[in-house]
Amino acid sequence: DSLGRLVNNNASESHISLKINSNILRYNFSSSMKLIKTETNRYIKAPTALYIPPREMFSLFDGFISLYEKREVSFDETYLDLAKALNAAPLKGQAYERSIELIQPLLDKWNIQVVKKNNRFYIIEEGKEYEAHLVAEGLRKMATMLYLVINGELKENSILFWDEPEANLNPSLISVVAELLVNLAKNGIQIFICT
């Protein structure tokens, strides 16, 4: 019920020390405190972490953020986080060029682009444009990865948690996904896969 209840009943104060990337944050508080005091006044920037759930989000994106924030829905908050990450516009200039380098192994094997128009995603494959909900789920998962890279949400020092990347994926694309993940890891993205 209160911050002070975190303090052991026999102790007068609690001390917490947190080390992130060789930066240390220290906190002290007593059983009567309502606010925490920090011993240091530094902000430590945590790496961006993205979780991609087993069910794809691409075809659900249009209106999902508003729906989630205003109504009871049977999706957990990780879907909202992913929708917000997908909501960012693509990078431009050198940042965009750098993002393309991260996904180049995939683009070399598969002529695909992902665009967002009027809050809907479209997948352009071999010059033909398809609405996201009209293509196979495995293709939507790949398009999600591509878009997260080109909009800068998945970048160096990011952490990616991908649950069942192989689910509903065309078997011929599994090696392409593996190459993409290896290339992302080589470029400083930490990857956790659950299958």
Locate the predicted segments by residue.
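Conserved ATPase "switch" residues in P-loop NTPase domains
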Residues: 185-186
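Walker B catalytic acidic pair
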Residues: 163-165
